[in-house]
Amino acid sequence: MKWLSKTCIVTLILISCEDAKYSLDNPFDPENIDLRPPALFFHPPNILAGLDTSISVELYGLELEPAAAAHLDIRYDWGSLTVDSVVPGPFFKGQNSPMEIAIDEQGVLDIFIFYLPDPQSDESLAGTWSLATVYLSTISTGESELLYGENTTLVDAKNDSIQIKDFGKGYISVE
């Protein structure tokens, strides 16, 4: 009798359980951004902000090879935005913090990031990581586009260029 009771309980549990159904369509997931890796993109790709506010955008790499340095040539509408600061992301962090130089000139932000070698490595790990975060202030209303310029390059520890197949765009709408 106990055996029959246990069998009925186990049977009820098995037939009443159902696998969870998840909708895996987050537009911010790297698999859903429609870029061929290795790629560079802006996260978030679309920003809605008010006038005279501070915003941030991350410069992301999708399935990047290990790198020792980067020159990120960022184009933006300098009549609508001002660059406040740039902070290196985790892609170039090892035992030492990376060295970063940012030069902002009339809508062209040149960011140079260098991995500082340590006893274990002379370049970053591969993967999908944030290369840097750019902090901006909005100064006029309208639409602004963020682009990676033609001078954007990544190099490995031997100073060989790392191929980037695709570049995403970013959009900032200021109301």
Which residues does each PLM region occupy?
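Sec-dependent bacterial lipoprotein signal peptides
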Residues: 1-16
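Acidic, low-complexity intrinsically disordered segments
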Residues: 17-175
